[in-house]
A protein has these predicted regions:
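Conserved FAD-binding catalytic core of PHBH/FMO-like flavoproteins
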Residues: 220, 225, 234-238, 243-386, ...
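Conserved Rossmann-like nucleotide-cofactor binding loop
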Residues: 118, 141, 269
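Glycine-rich FAD pyrophosphate-binding loop
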Residues: 127-149
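Charged, low-complexity interaction regions
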Residues: 13, 17, 28-39
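Conserved mid-domain beta->alpha element of the FAD-binding
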Residues: 115-128, 264, 296, 382-463, ...
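Active-site-adjacent segment of FAD-dependent monooxygenases/related oxidoreductases
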Residues: 146-221
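C-terminal helical "tail/cap" subdomain of flavin- and related membrane-associated enzymes
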Residues: 93-104, 430-543
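Beta1/beta-strand and adjacent pyrophosphate-binding region of the FAD-binding site
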Residues: 102-116
Length: 543
């Protein structure tokens, strides 16, 4: 009870709208998160006030005072707008649905749906700019144990991701968690190997990093920031776009929050995207690869050394299967096998011990002695699927925007999924900085700057699947790649291989592909250049 309100209440206690307005003002003074028991306490306080003023121990509030009671369920939580002055509250009209302006009064906090790599990085980026952030993640806290939900746990960090991590001051902590990969080691069916460097010098490398370890680091730093609150086991159930309200499920309860604005960073099967696009004119395309994947482990030697070359991405290319290996800091390797879902020698036909051994004896005989737990790992590890997602629009007005896989999931074969998601965060922050308070313009500019290029990345990722599966073992392909490296060495500012532009620069994906096409046309259009290319390529191949 606020003493300064007593004189006014004594004069106007018989007016139900005054009592209702007072109750609303009381609730606003509570601030923050209001549960049902707090609401009940407020009602009780107001009843006691009436009794005190009337000297009536049996006074009770009429139904008109209980405005809003049915709207706050026993297990709900809602963010209530900040308090208005007492005289303003008294003059307020009868209760109306909350508006966007009311929601923004909650200290301007942003809700990020999804606490994975992109969500946790963006939370930290916003917090460093003084923005309050609430991260809602449907899974339990990954720092307390568990796995990555069946997804590949090793990722290739390259220039775009490095740039984003540098912007938030974390790159010096991330790099020690990674293993440098200087190129590919191609394993032939006969057991032979061939090394293909990633670039023309030792600086053009990739970095293998454990997804879970990186996610834990980002969450730790986000949680340490006073502007960030992390909420695990919170699944987005519904988005009320008109009221600008999120409804989440947590431990069997429904929670309603009303942030200033929302970021959907909840992955390829994004609930935020589904809710944002519900009832809207939106484009959406989802494409599954007819191949799936299964993860296996190649353990380190007893002394901690690696059974195969550590500082490389290992590839076993086969027409009917593809093995890729990422190194780990402890000397082990995470192997990912890609196979067709159906047909001969597929996941559908490789279900028992005999079939597993026969598959490896046929396609990957050099791996068999290195994998003593092959059958057990095969039986215990799930089979995952791969999807490409393209959609539009990526935002709605100035209130909700998507980043990462939620708006552009790609196949993993170019190693750019995480890097492009991190680049989204950088691009969104830059757009917000350029457009100031005009968030709708910032969201539109962000999408315009990114969507054409992530669409290009989707096509590049598909094409690289064919490259890894078939082309990397071709002498002509290898000679062409070496020619690219040689031309880049002699003409570093003029000739850039496509892979160099994608992995080792921040040139937008679409611009990189367009430049690569121009270079190809120039080379093909010059008889002298073509003859020289063949000669140089042959020399490099034989060298």
């Amino acid at each position: 009870m606020v003493e300064t309100d007593l004189p006014f209440l004594r004069r106007h206690i018989d007016e139900p709208t005054v009592r209702a307005a007072y109750l609303r003002s009381y609730l606003r003074r509570l601030g923050g998160t209001v549960r049902r028991n707090y609401f009940d306490q407020a009602v009780t306080a107001l009843v006691e006030t009436e009794r005190e003023l009337r000297g009536d121990s049996h006074a009770s509030l009429p139904a008109s005072v209980r405005i809003g009671t049915p709207a706050i369920a026993a297990n709900d939580r809602t963010v209530v707008p900040a308090a208005a002055p007492a005289d303003t509250a008294v003059a307020a009209a009868p209760e109306q649905p909350a508006t966007a302006t009311d929601a923004e009064a909650d200290n301007g906090r942003v809700a990020i749906v999804g606490g994975g790599l992109a969500g946790s990085l963006l939370a930290l980026s916003l917090a460093r700019q003084g923005v309050g952030v609430d991260v809602y993640e449907r899974r339990p806290d990954p720092r307390l144990g568990g796995d990555a939900g069946g997804r590949s746990i090793n990722l290739g960090l390259s220039k775009r991701g490095i740039q984003a991590l540098t912007e938030v001051g974390l790159i010096d902590e991330v790099m020690p968690l990674s293993v440098t990969m200087r190129g590919r080691v191609i394993h032939s069916p006969d057991g032979g190997t061939r090394f293909q460097p990633y670039g023309k010098n030792g600086g053009e490398v990739l970095h293998s990093i454990d997804r879970n370890e990186l996610n834990r680091l980002l969450l730790d730093h986000a949680q340490r920031h006073p502007q960030v609150r992390l909420h695990f086991d919170h699944r987005l159930a519904h988005v009320d776009k008109d009221r600008r309200e999120l409804e989440l499920e947590s431990n069997g309860e429904r929670v309603r929050v009303r942030p200033s604005w929302v970021v959907g960073a909840d992955g390829a099967f994004s609930r935020a995207r589904q809710e944002m696009q519900r009832g809207e004119r939106a484009d959406f395309q989802q494409e599954y690869l007819e191949w799936g994947y299964k993860e296996l482990s190649l353990s380190a030697l007893p002394d901690g050394g690696s059974q195969i070359e550590l500082e490389a991405l290992h590839v076993w290319p086969r027409l009917h299967g593809l093995f890729v290996s990422h190194p780990n800091r402890d000397g082990s390797h995470t192997l990912t096998l890609f196979l067709p879902f159906e047909g001969p020698d597929s996941f559908a036909t490789t279900t028992g011990e005999a079939e597993v051994k026969a598959l490896f004896d046929k396609y990957f005989p050099d791996l068999v002695p290195l994998l003593p737990n092959l059958v057990d790992d095969w039986m215990s590890h799930p089979t995952g699927s791969l999807t490409t997602i393209r959609t539009g629009r990526w935002h709605r007005d100035d209130w909700i925007v998507l980043v990462g896989d939620a708006c552009h999931a790609v196949y993993p074969f170019y190693g750019q999924g995480m890097n492009s998601a991190f680049e989204d965060c950088s691009a969104l922050m830059a757009a917000l900085a350029r457009h100031g308070q005009n968030r709708a313009a910032a969201f539109a500019a962000y999408e315009q700057s990114r969507r054409p290029h992530t669409d290009t990345l989707a096509e590049l990722s598909k094409a690289n699947f064919v490259e890894l599966k078939q082309k990397v073992k071709s002498p002509w392909f290898v000679a062409r790649k070496r020619l690219d490296v040689a031309l880049n060495r002699f003409l570093p500012k003029t000739w850039l291989p496509l892979y160099t532009m994608i992995a080792h620069t921040t040139i937008p994906y679409g611009d990189a592909l367009a430049r690569a096409h121009r270079q190809e046309r120039f080379l093909a259009g010059s008889a002298v250049g073509l003859a020289g290319a063949i000669g140089v390529g042959a020399w490099l191949w034989l060298a």
